[in-house]
Regions:
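N-terminal presequence-like segments and the immediate start of the first folded domain
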Residues: 4-86, 90-103, 112-166
Length: 166
């Protein structure tokens, strides 16, 4: 008699835990001080969710016929960021995910020679805000953006790495 009761209790607790896990949602904490900058201060992933680590993605050449390593070949930071986001979207589509699943993002920007060697943060943000913090896709990731000395190809200015939750 004790075994059936114990099994029923364990089964009920398991179902309750599964229901709670499915009902739990990712929590995105806004920046403090009423900031409207389009990133999350933090993203909390509840138990039972799957975390996916997506490799860094770089842009496709803007003009493959141009001289490799030039701005004509790759484009500026905004152009490269738009291309990179398009390539990430293409990858996410094959995984049945979208930008709303992005919980964290690390952005690597090379200093743009046309900007005196400084990263073009404004150009990057012009691309980023087309995909995040929009009416259609309001979910904001926790994000870090850093300037790096270089990426895998001369003239490449953008690489983006994302972590996703489903």
């Amino acid at each position: 008699m004790k075994k059936p009761v114990r099994a029923a209790i364990v089964g009920a607790l398991g179902l309750a835990a599964a229901g709670a896990s499915n009902a739990a949602d990712v929590v995105r904490y806004p920046l403090l001080g009423g900031s409207t900058f389009p990133i999350a201060r933090a993203v909390e992933v509840p138990a039972g969710k799957t975390i996916i680590f997506h490799s860094g993605t770089t842009p496709a050449p803007l003009d493959p016929k141009a001289e490799q390593g030039t701005a004509a070949y790759w484009g500026d930071t905004k152009t490269q960021a738009l291309s990179t986001f398009a390539r990430i979207k293409e990858s996410l589509d094959t995984m049945k995910l979208d930008f709303g699943n992005v919980a964290a993002m690390t952005v690597y920007l090379v200093g743009d020679p046309a900007k005196g060697g400084r990263m073009d943060f404004e150009g990057f943000m012009a691309a980023y805000t087309q995909f995040f913090g929009t009416k259609e896709q309001p979910n904001l990731p926790a994000r870090s953006t850093v300037q790096v000395a270089g990426l895998v190809a001369p003239g490449m200015l953008v690489e983006i790495e994302v972590q996703l939750v489903k």
